[in-house]
Amino acid sequence: EAIVAEFEADLSGEDLRVIAIDLRAKINDGVVVLFSKGQERATLVAAVGAAAKSGGVKAGEIVKTASVLLGGGGGGKDDFAQGGGNNQELIGDAVKEIKKFLESVK
């Protein structure tokens, strides 16, 4: 199971982390990718549960892929990663790309 969502509110990376980890636990260790549109920058986090990790999904790879699209960078571990970029207008494209990737690994 996966949740990929965008918040219009300017949430911090820490806010997104708390929400993502809580949601990951509620969807039985699935994948949660959250984006936030800030005043000047887009922020994203990915939280990946054990079952999804064993299926080849890695949070760091998700964040790197999306961050490049957003004109920035990021990374982390297999279970949690954080990043962002300055091209907030491309969040929709990043969401589509992540959904397509997650469909391909099901």
Residue ranges with predicted function:
Residues 2-106:
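Glycine-rich, acidic loop segments that terminate in or are immediately followed by a histidine
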